[in-house]
Amino acid sequence: MSKQKIRIRLKAFDYKLIDQSAAEIVDTAKRTGAIVKGPVPLPTRMKRFDILRSPHVNKTSRDQFEIRTHQRLMDIVDPTDKTVDALMKLDLPAGVDVEIKLQ
């Protein structure tokens, strides 16, 4: 698996959870002898929703809600077979979305 790179992209609503997961991935990869670049924080995406408070009148009175999606990006350069096996066995929290690409 020489001359390859694994790109890992993490997404979560909770920044503490995503930082903890990124630290676990970095520790696992370094323990197996791979070179890790990152985690790089990507821009946080915010979705905002305006909802009427009253069902009938008072159009100017509204509630505002937002969802923040935090993202991190990591590259693992020259992964070994041990690195891939360790990453596959890694147990991450349920609130973290993981995308893995081989390049």
UniProtKB/Swiss-Prot annotation:
The keyword Cell membrane does not apply. The keyword Ribonucleoprotein applies. GO terms for molecular function: structural constituent of ribosome; tRNA binding. Pfam families: Ribosomal_S10. Signal peptide: none annotated. GO terms for biological process: translation. Gene3D superfamilies: Ribosomal protein S10 domain. Keywords: Ribonucleoprotein, Ribosomal protein. SMART domains: Ribosomal_S10 (SM01403). One of its GO terms (cellular component) is ribonucleoprotein complex. Belongs to the universal ribosomal protein uS10 family. HAMAP family: Ribosomal_uS10. Involved in the binding of tRNA to the ribosomes. Part of the 30S ribosomal subunit. This is Small ribosomal subunit protein uS10. It comes from Delftia acidovorans (strain DSM 14801 / SPH-1). The gene is rpsJ.
